[in-house]
C-alpha cells in the first residue's frame, strides 16, 4: 500500500516508465493497468535463468551467455486514502545452444528499482 491517492500513484507510474525509457504497451487508467512492451536485457544481469549442472546460466561467470526479454505489469487500485500497487514481471531467456525459451525471473534489484521509484514519487511532498 502507498499512502497517496490513486491519481498521484498513477502519475508516478507513468513518470517512472518515461524516465526509465520503458515502452508502454497497455495504458488503461479506468482499470488501473499499465503494461510495458518487451525490454531487452542480459541473462545474469537483468534476469536469473537458473543453472545447468551447477553452473549459472549467463552473466557473472556463467558458462552460457544470452539475451533476456522482460516486461512489467502494474496494477494501481484505490483503497480509500491509500492506493494498492501490484507489480508483476515476466522474463524469458534465449541462448543459441538451447532450443526454445528459458523460463527466468527478473533480477530482484531491477524490480525493486521500479517499485521504489513509483513509491518515492507518489509520496514526495508536492
Which ranges hold each PLM region?
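Ser/Thr-rich, low-complexity intrinsically disordered terminal regions
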Residues: 1-126
